[in-house]
Amino acid sequence: MTKRHSGTLSSSVLPQTNRLSLLRNRESTSVLYTIDLDMESDVEDAFFHLDRELHDLKQQISSQSKQNFVLERDVRYLDSKIALLIQNRMAQEEQHEFAKRLNDNYNAVKGSFPDDRKLQLYGALFFLLQSEPAYIASLVRRVKLFNMDALLQIVMFNIYGNQYESREEHLLLSLFQMVLTTEFEATSDVLSLLRANTPVSRMLTTYTRRGPGQAYLRSILYQCINDVAIHPDLQLDIHPLSVYRYLVNTGQLSPSEDDNLLTNEEVSEFPAVKNAIQERSAQLLLLTKRFLDAVLNSIDEIPYGIRWVCKLIRNLTNRLFPSISDSTICSLIGGFFFLRFVNPAIISPQTSMLLDSCPSDNVRKTLATIAKIIQSVANGTSSTKTHLDVSFQPMLKEYEEKVHNLLRKLGNVGDFFEALELDQYIALSKKSLALEMTVNEIYLTHEIILENLDNLYDPDSHVHLILQELGEPCKSVPQEDNCLVTLPLYNRWDSSIPDLKQNLKVTREDILYVDAKTLFIQLLRLLPSGHPATRVPLDLPLIADSVSSLKSMSLMKKGIRAIELLDELSTLRLVDKENRYEPLTSEVEKEFIDLDALYERIRAERDALQDVHRAICDHNEYLQTQLQIYGSYLNNARSQIKPSHSDSKGFSRGVGVVGIKPKNIKSSNTVKLSSQQLKKESVLLNCTIPEFNVSNTYFTFSSPSTDNFVIAVYQRGHSKVLVEVCICLDDVLQRRYASNPVVDLGFLTFEANKLYHLFEQLFLRK
């Protein structure tokens, strides 16, 4: 492209530079038509209607994804309670909470916000939160764990809820960069950063639940998953003791005399067991190769945001931990891409719209084993972490290298910062911004910010000023009043728009140039097919004159505006009037010639997203059915339970229930237990706090809200807390059924079953 020499503007004096390089780094045609959609265009050709259809489809997927996310969260919560309900071990108040969750209306009705003045203030607040990610980044790092899921839902599905809109996607990625950078700088153990249950890992996991990520998983894993699911009775468990018991139960092997004392090592030497493991390993590897090949061959389909996060992880690791090996960095990236993104979909395919119903036990175990093999390959530990027959190790090693090559290539994507700058300018200057949120989501965001306000932002910050005017947050409204409102975003401080003039990256010249290109493409689409002005090489003044001659006042104005833009660009020396207004003419020609190909690409994208939308709607029906089943359970259980004032009495201790008797329970519902007690009962497995000593430390446990707990560690004689962590009951329940039932909270490690029973004894039966 020829260098453009800019003239002098009142705003700044630009250097002689290659303008609009940012548009060279992305498909500018798509951008132009996004802009075109936001303008009240006179063009309503087939391209316009197709692009509008695609735009609406993306909006529907974004909206439905949020609704499914909320449903999945509540199904998980109710699923964790259903066992207690069936066993008649749920207190009356918990049953009321259970019933409330079942009666919630998941299809929020649109309405209006009850206070117009506060609506404008909230519009200014959410404008700041959306356009300046630093505010949310500070909040995410400090919010209490029991508020984390609610905050992430609002961030991912409301504040940045347009999941296919580049500006909001790039702002969200900017948020990730801020949070991850801070976490990487603060950690001493980078290897566990993305594997432990931290705010960062939960944020990244929630991000993968958005529409683009789920669409990708469906496109590459659907067939693989269903090829496994069509064989519900196929046994492919390769754990030696499990294989041994299967062979004994089916009469293929006589039981050993010391059957209950056998170990994995011993039974793995039995010829029948060894042969069975070898046969099953061969089948497992064949299936696993299909999954891996599907992922390895799909790098160009992986959403940009997922790849950019992988790039960010690699860059941060290289900068802050330069001595870490490349294979370890690949393992770190695999801790996000496979552990948080791909493998959860394999383990629970029904939650990712990959199966229409729950898999059989055999299929579930097979998929879990496949996911485990894939993760060990990504971690570079396939030779030590699987029970596969040793003869298959060379093939696993070969795939380790292939997977690591993929993990290296994932980060080979460009940055978005210049594109975001232009998107910000266009969004803030050319269209009204708005969010759709429920009343309670607005109030909850207000409450969370207010709780953390003094520790987050400068007292003179704009957020502080708005919160002072808003005052205390309102209490949540009943579900019937929790309507969905449109929240117009209000740019109260012009300085919040990116300082384009200072950075000299996107300037007035850039915007004029983009406007001109957009307008001339639009004019070409207005002219009849075969019109002389549409023939290449294009004559831009002829195009403008031809449209001006059409019998329409609005079209005449467009033609005049096109001539004015050419004159202005020529005066600014951004185009060469003596050389056919180059380089603008060449760019318009290229975009015009590529219209047919672009039309086909958009049609293919629309068709693919229609399939995704159908799957999301089907999954919504499945989740609604689950809630109906839980409702039946609740009604049945309630009919059998007689009200009692001694809910906590009469429970016998089951196997593994801890026998700790707390020394004192404070009025604030805080329980104090010694480290020795917790160690003796094997509740506490490990503590890596530097100041920790079993003899002179103690723990406090509290439950600030239903199913959320705070654990704090103190030194005797000191009031300052050494470590304080928050954990929700769902996380403990999930770890109880893991192969290694351990709850890792960073400095503290607990046995999941013992910790659950401790919570049950102290809080859940009250």
UniProtKB/Swiss-Prot annotation:
Gene for this chain: gap1
Keywords assigned by UniProt, alphabetized: GTPase activation
InterPro entries documented for this protein: RasGAP_C, RasGAP_CS, RasGAP_dom, Rho_GTPase_activation_prot
Gene Ontology, cellular component aspect: cell cortex; cell cortex of cell tip; cell periphery; cortical dynamic polarity patch; cytosol; division septum; mating projection; nucleus
Keyword Hydrolase: no
SMART domains per UniProt: RasGAP
Protein name: GTPase-activating protein
Organism: Schizosaccharomyces pombe (strain 972 / ATCC 24843) (Fission yeast)
Summary of the function given for this chain in its UniProt record: Inhibitory regulator of the Ras-cyclic AMP pathway. Stimulates the GTPase activity of Ras1.
